[in-house]
């Protein structure tokens, strides 16, 4: 358990403290479930009604909401960001070992930096280069000639194929697979012939990749993930895709091959994006968006029909199926009106 005085947390956040500065904080919790010893946060007015019954020892809030607070408080400009900073300070996620497990298999010509940790049953193949403070989780595989930069961590059972390049301070969650062959085939008189994937995957610095996400290597050119990209769980990123810096991709997104996504984009969960198109910088695609052509202007884009009662949805679907015929009828009426107007 981590314990911190409220005054120390206030100093870390540069927050104004109201109440007992000697309160000991032992954890962070939501406003509904917080107990004695916890610090919570009031994100916005929607949760104000829950503040009076909150059992936390302290709360993070904005100046405007201080008058409603009967417990110790840290007053900040943005309570949510402050909560995240405190959560990072009090994170109890186990620290990885910086030892090399006896069961790890490491090629004799692999180059390991200082303070490298390699878990049990991990495999490090020939000519791999691991920077300082790299952590390779148990059961992970790092293929031949792969390079991993300083401070990057692979959780358990991550697979990195040959000749992949991963930058500094990246975090790759369990089950991720990076550098596997893409879906590249050509049909020769009824027989599918596999296209060799001669490119690789190049990942920048400060990139986070979620559990069970797959990133395919390029066919000729490389698949590229630029600095600061964050990718959620169970995403599929096909061969030759390029993702611009600081783009955020939610869970279950599917990206077809040779797609280029700009910088500072946000892709909502379960979206599907066609290949061989470009999406410009600062584009947001809402959840379950289907993108079939290039996007050249920044903005928020949506597609699909939001959930409805089943009976209503069937009526909507029936109307959609009739749109083509309705359009033809409207055009016919317009033509008749034009003739009448010019008589």
Swiss-Prot record:
Entry keyword annotation includes DNA damage: no
Active site (UniProt): 239
Keywords of this entry: Acyltransferase, Lipid A biosynthesis, Lipid biosynthesis, Lipid metabolism, Repeat, Transferase
Catalytic activity annotation: a UDP-3-O-[(3R)-3-hydroxyacyl]-alpha-D-glucosamine + a (3R)-hydroxyacyl-[ACP] = a UDP-2-N,3-O-bis[(3R)-3-hydroxyacyl]-alpha-D-glucosamine + holo-[ACP] + H(+); UDP-3-O-[(3R)-3-hydroxytetradecanoyl]-alpha-D-glucosamine + (3R)-hydroxytetradecanoyl-[ACP] = UDP-2-N,3-O-bis[(3R)-3-hydroxytetradecanoyl]-alpha-D-glucosamine + holo-[ACP] + H(+)
SUPFAM superfamilies on file: Trimeric LpxA-like enzymes
Database matches in PROSITE patterns: HEXAPEP_TRANSFERASES (PS00101)
Database matches in Pfam families: Hexapep, Hexapep_2, LpxD
Gene Ontology biological-process annotations: lipid A biosynthetic process
Pathway: Glycolipid biosynthesis; lipid IV(A) biosynthesis; lipid IV(A) from (3R)-3-hydroxytetradecanoyl-[acyl-carrier-protein] and UDP-N-acetyl-alpha-D-glucosamine: step 3/6
Gene Ontology molecular function: N-acyltransferase activity; UDP-3-O-(R-3-hydroxymyristoyl)-glucosamine N-acyltransferase activity
Assigned EC number: 2.3.1.191
Subunit structure: Homotrimer.
Family: Belongs to the transferase hexapeptide repeat family. LpxD subfamily.
Reported function: Catalyzes the N-acylation of UDP-3-O-(hydroxytetradecanoyl)glucosamine using 3-hydroxytetradecanoyl-ACP as the acyl donor. Is involved in the biosynthesis of lipid A, a phosphorylated glycolipid that anchors the lipopolysaccharide to the outer membrane of the cell.
Alphabetized NCBIfam families for the sequence: lipid_A_lpxD (TIGR01853), PRK00892.1 (NF002060)
Protein name from the UniProt record: UDP-3-O-(3-hydroxymyristoyl)glucosamine N-acyltransferase
Organism: Blochmanniella pennsylvanica (strain BPEN)
Upper classification of the organism: Bacteria, Pseudomonadati, Pseudomonadota, Gammaproteobacteria, Enterobacterales
Gene this protein is translated from: lpxD
């Amino acid at each position: 358990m981590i314990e911190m005085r409220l005054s120390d947390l206030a100093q870390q956040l540069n927050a104004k403290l109201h109440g007992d500065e000697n309160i000991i904080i032992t954890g962070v919790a939501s406003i509904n479930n917080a107990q004695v010893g916890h610090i919570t946060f009031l994100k916005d007015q929607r949760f104000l009604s829950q503040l009076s019954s909150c059992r936390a020892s302290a709360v993070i809030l904005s100046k405007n909401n201080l008058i409603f607070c009967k417990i110790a408080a840290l007053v900040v400009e943005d309570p949510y960001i402050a909560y995240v900073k405190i959560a990072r300070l009090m994170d109890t996620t186990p620290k990885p070992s910086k030892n090399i497990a006896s069961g790890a298999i490491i090629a004799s010509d692999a180059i390991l930096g200082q303070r490298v940790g390699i878990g049990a049953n991990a495999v490090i193949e020939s000519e791999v280069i691991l920077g300082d403070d790299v952590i390779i989780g148990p059961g992970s595989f790092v293929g031949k000639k792969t390079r991993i930069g300083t401070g990057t961590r692979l959780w358990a059972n991550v697979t990195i194929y040959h000749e992949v390049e991963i930058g500094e301070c990246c975090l790759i969650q369990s089950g991720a697979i990076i550098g596997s062959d893409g879906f590249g085939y050509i049909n020769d008189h009824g027989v599918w012939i596999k296209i060799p994937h001669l490119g690789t995957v190049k990942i920048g610095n400060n990139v986070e990749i979620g559990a069970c996400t797959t990133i395919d290597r390029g066919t000729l050119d490389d698949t590229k993930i630029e600095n600061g990209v964050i990718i959620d769980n169970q995403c599929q990123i096909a061969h030759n895709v390029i993702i611009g810096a600081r783009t955020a991709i939610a869970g279950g997104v599917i990206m077809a091959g040779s797609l280029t996504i700009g910088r500072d984009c946000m892709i909502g969960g379960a979206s599907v994006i066609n290949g061989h198109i470009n999406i410009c910088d600062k584009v947001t695609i809402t959840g379950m968006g289907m993108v079939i052509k290039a996007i050249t202007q920044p903005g928020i884009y949506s597609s699909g029909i939001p959930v409805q009662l089943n009976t209503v949805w069937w009526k909507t679907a029936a109307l959609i199926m009739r749109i083509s015929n309705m359009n033809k009828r409207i055009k016919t009426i317009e033509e008749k009106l034009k003739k009448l107007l010019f008589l």
